[in-house]
Amino acid sequence: MELVQIYECLCDVTRLRLLQVLAQGPLCVCHFQAILGEPQVKISKHLAYLRTRGLVEVERQGNWMVYALPAKPPRELRANLACLQDCARENPLFQRDLARLKKLAPKLAATGPAGCGCATC
C-alpha cells in the first residue's frame, strides 16, 4: 500500500476513531455505534472504505460481521497507529471513545466481538 493511500484513509476523523478503537481489538458495527455515537450507515460506510483499501479486515461470525485490523498491517499503518495512540491521549473525543470501549469490555469478554445480543445485531 502506498503512503498516500494510507493518509487518504487517515484524513477523516471518523476513520481515525474507528482505527483507534480497532487497535484495541475486533468489534462488530453495533459496538462502534455505541462507542462513537454515530449511526450505523455512517460507520458501515467508513468501514467499507477502510476495508477496500486493506486497512481493516472483516469476518462473518454467525449473524455478525466482525471488523479487525489486518493480521499483518502495512508498516506505514503500524507507525501511524502508534502515533495516533500517542496523540489520542490528549484528545477528549478519542479519550471518550476509549472510555466507552472500556465500559463495554465486560460484555465483550463474556460474548466476544460477535454475539452481543443487542437490538442492532
Which residue ranges define each predicted feature?
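N-terminal helix-turn-helix DNA-binding core of bacterial DNA-binding proteins
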Residues: 2-42, 48, 64-73
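Residue-identity detector for glycine
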Residues: 25, 37, 54, 62, ...
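C-terminal regulatory/oligomerization modules of transcriptional regulators
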Residues: 52, 71-121
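Compositionally biased, low-hydrophobicity segments enriched in charged and small polar residues
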Residues: 38-45, 58, 99, 103, ...
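Beta-hairpin "wing" of winged helix-turn-helix
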Residues: 52-61, 68-69
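Hydrophobic alpha-helical membrane-insertion segments
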Residues: 20-24, 55, 106
